[in-house]
Design a protein with these regions (language model features):
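Extracytoplasmic/secreted envelope proteins and their assembly/folding machinery
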Residues: 75, 94, 104, 123, ...
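Short, surface-exposed connector motifs at secondary-structure boundaries
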Residues: 106-107, 133-137, 213, 262-269
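Cap/insert and terminal regions of metallo-dependent hydrolase folds
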Residues: 2-27, 221-304
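Core dinuclear metal-dependent hydrolase active-site scaffold
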Residues: 5-7, 19-102, 171-227, 299-317
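Solvent-exposed loop/turn segments at secondary-structure junctions
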Residues: 91-93, 115-118, 147-148, 197, ...
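Active-site neighborhood of phospho(di)ester-bond hydrolases with catalytic His/Asp-centered motifs
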Residues: 86-90, 107-119, 142-144, 216-220, ...
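Active-site metal-binding motif and surrounding structural segment of the metallo-beta-lactamase
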Residues: 84, 91-142, 169, 231-236
């Protein structure tokens, strides 16, 4: 069992020791010592799992955010080449990553799919967690044209100038059908792209290519229709059930699945469902459209694309 898998097993053991020790003898020195050892083992395994996230053997992504929030909480942490990128800093982004001992100082940039409040709800907290209060720290924020306005407001509220401290906005401004590289180093290429529909709505998608493996992230955009999603190992796409899509005009899970299949996508992960029933319905409708490799994203889920083979591994972190 690898370090990531071991952390779940140790957490179960820790829970059993905690409750068992509390009931039958946590007030004794022996009980307290057992609980302390369990906590130490859990922390050690969590640290090892976090370290493994940043090795060079795979392209990885962690679904982050606040699972208890009733509001939209878009957040995905993509890890490759020893760096981390957060796509959409939704509610609970910083705390969900720090709880899992993921080192926020590895954060290279935040990428916004939409310049709206749900995408930046936790951006200030992400900045604070990633800079550890350094006086001269800057955090690049990429996104649509309106990103500059949002970043300026957050910098003003935090007392930052945006030049030597705070958030620094960058607008890649891709044209429909043409990608723009926003980061390239050590075998990792991060590209921004948009579609005709998403350009009208002010939305941007991102593709991460790392030594033959690829992840495409689009928030609520229609990235599954974009040429940039062709042959991607996995596409993370916001969608709605057929019933909701008919009323709102949103992208349905069935539409997303049909497009993913046409573009030879390896797997599609649906994001943004408000509840478990909606998530299950979306997956069922997507599979009914003829594309079986579909899953619903959940906070704490790890996606791992090993460089040594073509596997797509999905499991809890």
């Amino acid at each position: 069992m690898n370090a990531i898998g071991k952390s779940s097993a140790i957490f179960v053991t820790l829970s059993g020791l905690f409750w068992g020790g509390w009931i039958v003898g946590s007030q004794t020195p022996e009980g307290q010592e057992a609980i302390a050892r369990a906590y130490a083992a859990y922390e050690e395994q969590q640290s090892a799992a976090s370290a493994n996230l940043f090795d060079s053997t795979a392209l990885r992504a962690v679904v982050c955010g606040d699972p208890a929030s009733t509001e939209q909480k878009p957040c995905l942490a993509v890890v490759a080449a020893g760096r981390m990128f957060i796509v959409d800093a939704g509610s609970g982004a910083a705390s969900s990553l720090t709880r899992r001992n993921i080192p926020m100082e590895r954060l290279a940039a935040v990428l916004l799919t939409d310049a709206d409040l749900p995408q930046v709800a936790d951006l200030s907290a992400v900045y604070g967690a990633s800079t550890h209060g350094r006086a001269d720290a800057l955090l690049p924020v990429y996104g649509p044209a309106e990103t500059q306005r949002l970043v300026d407001g957050l910098n003003q509220a935090g007392g930052f100038d945006g030049a030597s401290r705070g958030l620094q906005a960058w607008g890649p401004s891709p044209e429909p059908g043409r990608s723009v590289i926003v980061f390239e180093a050590d075998g990792l290429v991060v590209s921004a792209f948009t579609t005709q529909e998403d350009a009208f709505e002010g939305r941007v998608g991102y593709r991460f290519d790392y030594r033959g493996r690829s992840i495409v992230v689009g928030g609520d955009g229609r990235v599954a229709t974009a040429s940039a999603a062709r042959d991607a190992d996995i596409v993370l796409q916001g969608a709605e059930t057929q019933r909701v899509a008919q009323v709102t005009g949103a992208f349905s899970a069935a539409e997303a699945a049909a497009n993913a299949q046409a573009l030879n996508t390896g797997m599609m992960m649906l994001t943004g469902a408000d509840n478990q029933i909606a998530a299950q319905t979306q997956v069922a409708e997507a599979r009914a459209a003829g594309f079986d490799e579909v899953a619903a994203a959940r906070v704490g889920m790890l996606v791992e694309l090993p460089l040594a083979n073509s596997e797509i591994n999905v499991r809890p972190l």
